[in-house]
């Protein structure tokens, strides 16, 4: 995935399924300059991680 698509997903009112290493995640935010997104596991929303947007996949 790229930064442009992550930003589109963040601004969308629709639910868009995204995974990180095969795990369903919600995207919390995205830093356009670094290409890093803050995501959290849908099943464990208490823990977020920062990942490169290239590691995210839209399902």
Swiss-Prot record:
UniProt GO BP: asexual sporulation; sporulation resulting in formation of a cellular spore
Highest rank taxon of the organism: Bacteria
GO cellular component entries: endospore-forming forespore
Keyword Hydrolase annotated: no
InterPro entries assigned to the protein according to its UniProt record, in alphabetical order: SASP_SspH
Signals that turn on the gene: Expressed only in the forespore compartment of sporulating cells.
Coiled coil residues, start to end: none
Keywords of the record: Sporulation
Subcellular location: Spore core
Homology family: Belongs to the SspH family.
Name of the protein described by the UniProt record: Small, acid-soluble spore protein H 1
UniProt source species: Bacillus anthracis
